[in-house]
Curated annotation (Swiss-Prot):
This is Pyridoxine 5'-phosphate synthase. The active site is at 43 (proton acceptor), 69 (proton acceptor), 185 (proton donor). Its EC number is 2.6.99.2. One of its GO terms (biological process) is pyridoxine biosynthetic process. GO terms for cellular component: cytosol. It comes from Gluconobacter oxydans (strain 621H). Pathway: Cofactor biosynthesis; pyridoxine 5'-phosphate biosynthesis; pyridoxine 5'-phosphate from D-erythrose 4-phosphate: step 5/5. The lineage of its organism: Bacteria, Pseudomonadati, Pseudomonadota, Alphaproteobacteria, Acetobacterales. It catalyses: 3-amino-2-oxopropyl phosphate + 1-deoxy-D-xylulose 5-phosphate = pyridoxine 5'-phosphate + phosphate + 2 H2O + H(+). NCBIfam families: pdxJ, PRK05265.1-2, PRK05265.1-3, PRK05265.1-5.
C-alpha cells in the first residue's frame, strides 16, 4: 500500500494571513490522520512564511509520523536534531519563490550536504532528498547515504508525456540503487494515478491540492478520496 503524507503548510498560510491561531494546522493534521493520512508533512521555511517554530513540537507529538521539510542549513539541522521527527526531507529554498520550484542539486552540493545528512542520521532521523528525476542525482543520493529520495513531480503536473517517462526511468534507477521511492509536488485527483503506478513507489506527499479542495468538500473526504485513488 502506498502511504499518503498530507502537507498542512497552507492551513498555516491561511492562519498567518490574518494572524492569530485560526485555522490551526495541528488541528488540520489531526483531522487528516483520523481520515487516513499515514503521515504529516510540514515545511519550516527560513522566512517562516507559513509553519512556525511553535507548530513543530505539536506536530511531532501527534500519532502519525512527522516529515519535516527543510532547507539544508545549519539552523534547520539543529532544529531537526533537537526535535527528532520521524523523517526530514531536504529541499531547495529561495526566499523569492512562491513554492519549491525544483529539486535539490545534490550533485553540485554533495560536499556541503554530506555532513548534514550524517548528522541527521546520527540523530535517528530518516533522511530523504527532494530531487529532480535524473539518474546522476539519484546515484549521488545513494552515495551520500540518504535512504530515501522524493522525486519532484512538478514538471509532470504541468503536462507532458516526456516528463512521465523521465519519472518512470528515474524510478528504475531508484530501485537499482536500493533506495526508497517517494514523490510529490503538484499532484491532484486527475494526475496522481500515473505517479501511483511508478515501480516501487512507497509514499506520496501532497498538500496544496488537498487543502484547496477541502474548501469545497471538507478535509476528511478529500484525504479519504486521495488515499483511495493512490491505492486503487
Amino acid at each position: 500500500m502506498i502511504r499518503l503524507g498530507v502537507n498542512i503548510d497552507h492551513v498555516a498560510t491561511l492562519r498567518n494571513a490574518r494572524g492569530g491561531t485560526f485555522p490551526d494546522p495541528v488541528a488540520a493534521a489531526e483531522l487528516a490522520i483520523a481520515s487516513g493520512a499515514d503521515g504529516i508533512t510540514a515545511h519550516l521555511r527560513e522566512d517562516r512564511r507559513h509553519i512556525r517554530d511553535a507548530d513543530m513540537p505539536r506536530l511531532r507529538a501527534l500519532s502519525a509520523p512527522l516529515n519535516f521539510e527543510m532547507a539544508a542549513t545549519d539552523e534547520m539541522v539543529r532544529i531537526a536534531c533537537d526535535l527528532r521527527p520521524h523523517a526530514c526531507c531536504l529541499v531547495p529554498e529561495k526566499r523569492q519563490e512562491v513554492t519549491t520550484e525544483g529539486g535539490l542539486d545534490i550533485v553540485g552540493q554533495s560536499e556541503a550536504l554530506k555532513p548534514k545528512i550524517a548528522r541527521l542520521r546520527d540523530a535517528g532521523i530518516r533522511v530523504s532528498l527532494f530531487i529532480d528525476p535524473e539518474a546522476r542525482q539519484i546515484e549521488t543520493a545513494a552515495a551520500l547515504g540518504a535512504p530515501v529520495v522524493e522525486l519532484h513531480t512538478g514538471a509532470y503536473a504541468l503536462g507532458g508525456s516526456e516528463e512521465l517517462e523521465r519519472l518512470r526511468s528515474a524510478a528504475g534507477t531508484v530501485a537499482a540503487c536500493g533506495l526508497e521511492l517517494h514523490a510529490g509536488h503538484g499532484l491532484t485527483y486527475d494526475n496522481v494515478g500515473a505517479i501511483a503506478d511508478l515501480t516501487g513507489l512507497a509514499e506520496l506527499n501532497i498538500g496544496h491540492f488537498l487543502i484547496g479542495q477541502a474548501i469545497f468538500d471538507g478535509l476528511g473526504p478529500v484525504v479519504r478520496k486521495m488515499k483511495s485513488l493512490i491505492n486503487s
